[in-house]
Amino acid sequence: MSSTVGRYAPSPSGRMHLGNLCCCLLAWLSAKSSGGKVVLRIEDLDAVRCPREFADLLEADLAWLGLAADEGGRKGGPRGPYYQSERSAIYEEYYQKLVRKGLVYPCFCSRSQLHAADAPHRSDGQVVYAGTCRNLTPEEIVLRTTRRKPAWRVMVPDETISFVDGHMGPYAENLAQDCGDFYLRRADGVFAYQLAVVVDDALMGVTQVVRGADLLSSTPRQLWLYRELGLPAPEFYHMPLLLAADGRRLSKRDGDESLEHLQARYTPEQIIGRLAYVCGLQNVPDPRTPAELADGFSWQRVPQNDIILPEGLF
């Protein structure tokens, strides 16, 4: 077996839709085609939105499709726990490393203040934090804490972080200009995705991260966190987003085709074959198992632009 360790890192807030399934398929194929393995980590930081029964369903769905993980989830393994809701003490340890470096500060900004019309925005519409609370005095912090419980941000340097994505190619961002100081912890104490994912991937031995292109812009700040925390960074492969026939992003909230509905009409092989077809891995939407696709898998066959699902394919 090769040293490649891929992973699934789903948030179990509902049944998986086609976009989630496509990401899992590519993650599995990318790892298995080089003789590697796949770890399943359940990203249930928000335990209210992500009940355990959804996590169990998700794991069963992956097995039904032939995409079962080698480690993690209910199967367990040597680097657990594999549920983020059970890893708070681990996140606390690494959070405190950043606190000791003097990089963490309280933020009292409300949602309306952050999204005000005059707030800095990226070209994709995301808000870049203006640093409003970065230089508050100790006295100001004490006063504001009596009025509002703060969230906690990390100070980023005026530095450009660049890397070569395994699928999308070169990418770079200036942390101060394009990202801004970002959240590490919510006001209710829950740790933020950016910190948790970095700590988890490093401690679970993940060497290859496959995820949607919507997370490409998160990578520079995560690479910076890996460096600040002294953790090894994986390789990244960002896949194109799967869009509905009308150009919308697929969403659990919008009721887009979930696996629950697909299972009533298709076999696992039919679903996998159709996903492989839209990803460029085969020329016709014939039924296939993941194992049948692994031998000939190549990222060069996967498009870089977003994929619009053909009408009537599912």
Language-model regions: role of each:
Residues M1-R122, A213-D214, S218-L231, R288:
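N-terminal Rossmann-like or analogous alpha/beta NTP/dinucleotide-binding catalytic cores
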Residues M1-R15, S33, V38, L65, ...:
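Non-catalytic terminal extensions that flank enzyme cores
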Residues H17, P81-A89, T146-R148, Q194-V199, ...:
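Noncatalytic linker/hinge segments flanking ATPase motor cores
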Residues A60, E93, A116, G131, ...:
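Charged/polar, solvent-exposed surface patches and flexible loops
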Residues Y82-K97, H121-V128, R148-D158, V278-L293:
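Short secondary-structure transition/capping segments
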Residues S112-S251, S258-L262, E311-F314:
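Active-site cores that bind ATP or allylic diphosphates and position pyrophosphate for catalysis
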